[in-house]
Amino acid sequence: LEKELPEVDRFYGKFNWKELISDLGKSYHQELATERVLTTPRHYAYVKIGEGCNRTCSYCSIPIITGAYQSRPMEEVVDEVRGLVAQGVKEFQMIAQDLTFYGLDRYKRMALPELVERVSDIPGVEWIRLHYGYPSHFPYDLLPVMRERDNVCKYMDIALQHISDPMLKMMRRNITKAETYELLERMRREVPGIHLRTTLMVGHPGETEQDFEELIRFVKDIRFERMGAFAYSHEEGTYAYQHYKDEIPQEVKQDRLDYLMRVQEGISADVNASKVGQTFRVIVDREEEDFYVGRTQYDSPEVDPEILISKDTPLSPGSFYQVKVIDAQAFDLYGKVLN
C-alpha cells in the first residue's frame, strides 16, 4: 500500500491504534475504552468479545490479517453492555471470529457460557444473540444457558463449511462428519426450538461431485433454518493457496453454489410456512411506507428474514410487540400485531 499510495502520510494497522492516538497528540484514557458511538439503529448493537483467530482453516486469511485470538476481559464486555443499555440498546449481537474460543487465552478455559450469563443478568438486556461459533470443541455447557434464559435467543450461528470427511480434512476443520451430526443433534435436543444458522462453501480444491452431492444430502437432512453459502476463493497467503491448485472452474463453482441456494430456498420456504398462525415476540426495526419491519428472536439483523407488519396499529421502532404470522414467503414473514 505504501508503494501504491505514496500520497498517504502514514499507515496504521488495526493493532497499533495507541500509536495513532499518540501521533494525534492525545492521551489514552482507560475509562473511555467502552464508550460507543452507535452506527446501528439505537435499539441493537454488536459487541465484539474477541479479536483474531487461532484456527488454521485452509482457505481463510483472517488469522493472517488479525493475528492470534485475544479475548476481551469479561468485565470490559459487561461494562460496555451496561453502557449501551443506558443508551437505550435492548438487543445485543455478541460477535467474534470464533466465539467458542473465548477465554482460552485469557482465562485458560472456555468462558463463553459464563460471559453470556453475566450479560444476561444485566437489567435491560432483552435479547442476546451469538455469532459466530466454531464446531470443533464446542462448549456444550452453553446449551443450558440458551435453554433456560429467556433473554438468550434460541439461535446459533455456526459455520460448518462442509460435511464430507475428505473435504473437512482438506479444509483443516478438525472435525468429522459424525461429530458434526452429533453436535447439531445435541443442539436441537438440548435447546428445543433453536434456529441454526450456518455457512457452507463449495468449490474448495479437491471437492468432487460426490463431495458436493454429500453436502446437498446433508442440507436436506438437517434443514437449517438459516443458511448462507459462498464459492471458494484462492486467497494469497492461505494454506490452500500454498498447497492446493484452484482447479475447479469458476462456472462449476457458481453452478454448485446456485443449486445449493435453490435447495435452501425451498427449505426456508417450508420453515417460514410452518410459522403461519403462530405468535411471536417481535422487535420493530423501522417503519416503511406500507408496513413496519421487525424480527423475531430467530432473526439477526441484515442477514435473516424479516417480518413485515401491517400498519393497522401505530408501532414504535425499537419496541417489542406480540405479532401473529398471517403469511410467509421463503425469506419474509407477514404479520399483524395482537396487542
Region locations from a protein language model:
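Short flexible coil/turn linkers enriched for glycine and charged/polar residues
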Residues: 39-43, 53-55, 152, 162, ...
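Extended hydrophobic-aromatic, low-complexity segments
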Residues: 154-155, 168-169, 192-195, 210-212, ...
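Active-site proximal loops enriched in glycine and acidic residues that flank catalytic Cys/His/Asp
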Residues: 96, 132, 160-162, 198-202, ...
